[in-house]
Swiss-Prot record:
Quaternary context: Homodimer.
Keyword Hydrolase part of the UniProt annotation: yes
Positions of Zn(2+) binding: 71, 110, 127
Keyword Transferase attributed: yes
Provenance organism: Streptomyces griseus
Protein name, per record: Purine nucleoside phosphorylase ORF3
Highest taxon, organism lineage: Bacteria
EC number: 2.4.2.1, 3.5.4.4, 2.4.2.28
């Protein structure tokens, strides 16, 4: 169920976790642990999956903050979960200084970005697809964390399973456009055609912002049958990344 669950062993420990597709109750083509509520799956199954994943991580499912992701750069600063009847805002990053509040990001090829400064007590989660990366969602998330007292030199960053630069085929013009905007994204597929490395671009942007403690998942969602991939399957589920502070 959980691909990665790491804890930063410092004051106010930060936790980072990424799911795979197993251990849930969703039926095909969303099987099994689909955590996305806007992909056509049974809402009851999604709710059960979200509760399973949260309990597995020792979290209260009611204290997990989800986003309405739209491939942009807007950030929400939160100090608690959304209200039961609240409209979840259209954002692609969320940050908080509230300990015990988990932030979640959904993906199925895009790069999930988890950020934490345990000293300041600030965490963030961002959804970095190609459009959001170019729009600046990574820098927007870091800037929002800094506004809450974080410092880039203290931030630990984890990127989760995503389509890799050897698989994310794009037209030559798109590769040139993205690489011109975000250094580190220029790539080539394993079969020799133009490609974009979104995760590489995320790490390049984080490095430029002064974030040196960075970690990347080894899993390519398109290649791995243990992960959901929109590019591979189209109708499919969503993985989740979670970050929180004790």
């Amino acid at each position: 169920m959980i691909v990665q669950h790491r804890t930063a062993p410092v004051t106010g420990s930060a936790h980072f976790a990424f799911t795979d597709r197993w251990g849930g109750v969703s039926a095909a083509p969303y099987g099994e642990l689909n955590l996305g509520g806007a992909v056509g799956d049974d809402p009851a199954a999604v709710g059960a999956n979200r509760e399973r994943a949260a309990r597995h991580l020792g979290l209260d499912p009611a204290h997990v903050v989800w986003m309405n992701q739209v491939h942009g750069r807007d950030v929400a600063v939160v100090d608690g979960p959304w209200g039961a009847d609240a409209e979840i805002p259209a954002v692609d990053a969320v940050v908080t200084a509230r300990r015990g509040l988990a932030l979640a990001v959904l993906t199925a090829d895009c790069t999930p970005v988890l950020l934490a400064d345990p000293v300041a007590g600030v965490v963030g989660a961002a959804h970095a697809g190609r459009p959001g990366l170019v729009a600046g969602v990574v820098s927007a998330a870091v800037e929002a964390m800094v506004a809450l007292g974080a410092h880039p030199s203290r931030i630990t960053a984890h990127t989760g399973p995503a389509v890799c630069g050897r698989c994310y085929e794009v037209p030559e013009e798109m590769r040139a456009e993205v690489a011109g905007a975000v250094p580190g994204t220029w790539s080539e597929t394993s079969w020799g055609t133009p490609a974009v490395d979104v995760t590489g671009g995320v790490h390049a942007q984080l490095a430029a912002l002064g974030v040196t403690d960075r970690h990347a998942s080894p899993f390519c969602t398109l290649e791995s049958g243990d992960h959901f991939s929109y590019r591979r399957d189209r109708t499919t589920g969503r993985l989740a990344g979670y970050v929180w502070l004790d």
